[in-house]
Amino acid sequence: MLRTMTIVRANPEGVHSTPGYHHVTVVPAGRTAYLAGQCPLDAAGALVGADDVDAQVDQVAANALAVLRSVGAGPKHVVRTVIYVVSADRSVLAQVWQRFLDSSLAPAFTTASTLLGVAQLGFPGQLVELDVTAALPDTP
């Protein structure tokens, strides 16, 4: 028999409101997937969108979706995200956040999420990286 996993996302009373994400995500014991940091690299390993934060977000989202699908999951199974952006400019951080919210990965960002401006990422020209944790759906 297939069990239905319930992921509970909440914003407790007494804590500030959020622009769409939740302060806490509770997952029953089960299988989890911890994705490596998703970078704006194409299948050949080449950087996509040097100096183009939107192109990099699009590639990162596509990569994250492909990796999630490879383990039978999708954006609705994501329980935590951390977005790293090479910028100290809040408008750039907001642009990246909005671009992810406008992507097919958008449901992943209704969960516990963190958005950070950083000094540097691993590849020359890399502006965006995404860490994802997902609670995998039960299997028959």
Where are these regions (language model features)?
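N-terminal presequence-like segments and the immediate start of the first folded domain
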Residues: 1-62, 66-79, 85-140
